């Protein structure tokens, strides 16, 4: 049976936030990447088969309202904490993808006891001990998205052979907002590694074996600093794991969320 998604909005801290939601079960909040998100992903559907999945669209990304006061990733995290409180979703699990992993990690440090489980997939947010996070200012946004795939064919599988004008505008707006909230330092926080040890919830950090955007050392550092974390590497994928191997990724996360 197809998963039916509802789309709507809520207000948190005086800011309109757009949401997608589907499924039943324990609540799972998915935080999307710095390139925004497609409205339909097999990965989302697979998680919604077992969980109440909530996907907020980051403020200022794509055509979502862009509040003037949101100037950093921690601002987004504070806003989302307020959103969860308003939705009665205390104790939800967080799944952060790339840039969304940074937001999820910040949220976890704010209320460590108010979290069921934490999943970070190729997370940004910490300075890699070796290597650098790919600077999207140095290449076009199309090249940046392509760099997220290990298999070049996966780009067309997800976005089609011809990119629409609306998709290009979407990426342009996402890039603009990323530069506002994560420019200096680029895509990491100096404070986050020092705050992660306070997060006691079980955590899973997943790294694509061929990630060309976030070095594996960043995921390793997150797993090292989180006191109850395990690190897994997925073969045959790059940074955009949820689009290259959606069902395999969903299976790993579902098993982790269900584990004792």
Where are these regions (language model features)?
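Catalytic active-site module of serine/aspartate enzymes centered on a nucleophile-bearing elbow/loop
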Residues: 229-260
């Amino acid at each position: 049976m197809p998963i039916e998604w509802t789309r709507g909005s809520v207000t948190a801290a005086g800011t309109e936030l757009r949401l997608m939601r589907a499924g039943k079960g324990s609540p799972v909040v998915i935080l999307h990447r710095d390139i925004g998100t497609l409205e339909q992903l097999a990965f989302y559907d697979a998680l919604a088969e077992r969980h109440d999945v909530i996907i907020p669209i980051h403020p200022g990304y794509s055509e979502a309202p862009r509040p003037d006061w949101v100037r950093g990733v921690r601002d987004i995290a504070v806003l989302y904490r307020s959103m969860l409180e308003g939705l009665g979703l205390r104790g939800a699990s967080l799944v952060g993808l790339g840039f969304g992993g940074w937001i999820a990690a910040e949220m976890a440090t704010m209320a460590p006891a108010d979290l069921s489980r934490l999943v970070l997939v190729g997370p940004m947010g910490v300075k890699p001990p070796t290597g650098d996070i790919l600077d999207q200012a140095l290449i076009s946004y199309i090249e940046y998205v392509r760099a997220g795939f290990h298999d070049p064919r996966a780009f067309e599988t997800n976005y089609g052979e011809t990119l629409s004008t609306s998709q290009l505008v979407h990426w342009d707006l996402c890039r603009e907002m990323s530069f506002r909230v994560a420019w200096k330092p680029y895509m990491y926080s100096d404070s986050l590694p020092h705050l992660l040890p306070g997060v006691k919830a079980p955590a899973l950090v997943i790294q694509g074996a061929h990630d060309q955007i976030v070095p594996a050392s960043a995921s390793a550092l997150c797993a090292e600093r989180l006191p109850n974390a395990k690190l897994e590497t997925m073969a045959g994928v790059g940074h955009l794991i949820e689009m290259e191997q959606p069902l395999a990724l969903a299976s790993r996360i579902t098993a982790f969320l269900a584990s004792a």
